[in-house]
Amino acid sequence: MSVQEQKKKAPRDNGAPDHMKNLHPLMLKNYGKWKHYEKVRTGVLKRVAESGDVLYVVRAGSPRTMSIITMRKICDIADKYCQGHIRFTSRANVEFLIGNEKDVEPLIKAVEKDLGWPVGGTGASLSNIIHTQGWLHCNLPGTDAAGSVKALMDELFNDFITENLPQRVKISTSCCSINCGGQADIAINVQHHHPPRVDNKGVGVCEHPKVVAICPVAAIRPSMADGKASLEVVPEKCMYCGACHGQCPSMEIRDAQTDTLSIWIGGKAASTRKGPSFMKLAVWGLPNNAPRWPEVGEAVKKIIEVYRTGARPYERLGEWVERIGWKRFFELTGFPFTKYHIDDFKNARATLNTSSHVRL
């Protein structure tokens, strides 16, 4: 292909855009040559380059779902103090990048006054809670993830603006059992307690092969109802995840009378110490009590308090539980231990303690 033909081609429009052109000038200048960073205070980091350049990072907790008016306020602050450079973290924190030390305090005051947001979330603190769409946008929410995050962060506000925990704590909330919020130290998920109810009239407009294929445990199969093609659920196989409802709204699994919330703990993605780990059930059957979810807030605060007093420095929540044993964890929290806490999946043997070292 000639040079002229290459110039006529449209710019690439797939994949991630080139991030280099959006970096702060100091980040671009010292790319790959950073020496160390220092903690100035909770929410403020000082990054020092080999060249001696210093870049300050101010982290503020955002509500994630924002109006265009709020976005313009963020941009105005960034234009005034950060040469127009900000970035969002994976947990919806906003990080303002500052090259001049004298602009740090004025920026913090502007964030707290104009946006009403707290500065924090670094080091051994509670980071912003990651959550799924909830009632705002998701097509199968059993609860409002965004609303529960607001209620929960009101209760845990001081842990965001101070570093008084043994190690960082990450919380996620998911509006359904599929757990789009991902692995976290503490995760709040919806629990359904019965298989989906099939509406034979409405299910006819759904693509049956897709609905059958999306079930992770092969609990859905074709059937006939009133002489027409339909679907049926095998109750013995169904694990009440609700994935089928996303493919076919006529397979309704949500139930305001029976749906509850559960709390899972010990998940992490970091490779430190024992490496990444999945979450395990801590407490289930909590009422889906909108709009403040007080029972969930009390349970989460109880977990954080026993972790705060019992864990060693730099020990993540799941690592602390593994060290003291789950029996001791249930004693400290007062949560009831039930048969539903025991992993009875067919491949559960890989997760069970098979050594002779048992804490009694």
Regions found by a protein language model. Name each.
Residues K268-A311:
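A hydrophobic, small-residue-rich beta->alpha segment in the mid-to-C-terminal subdomain
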Residues Q6, L28-G32, Y56-H208, I214, ...:
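Small-residue-enriched alpha-helical segments and adjacent helix-cap loops
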Residues M1-V48, N288-A290, K302-E305, E322-E331:
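Acidic/polar, glycine-rich intrinsically disordered N-terminal extensions of enzymes
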Residues R87, K210-V233, K237-L261:
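Iron-sulfur cluster-binding cysteine motifs and their immediate structural context
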Residues P17-M66, N128-W135, F278-G285:
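Short glycine-/aliphatic-rich beta-strand segments at the starts of folded cytosolic domains
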Residues T132, K170-S177, L317-F330, A350:
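A glycine-rich phosphate-binding loop feature that marks nucleotide/adenosyl-phosphate handling sites
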Residues F330-L332, Y340-L360:
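Long C-terminal interaction/binding lobes of large macromolecular proteins
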Residues K39-R47, K73-G84, K268:
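Short amphipathic beta-strand starts and helix->beta connectors
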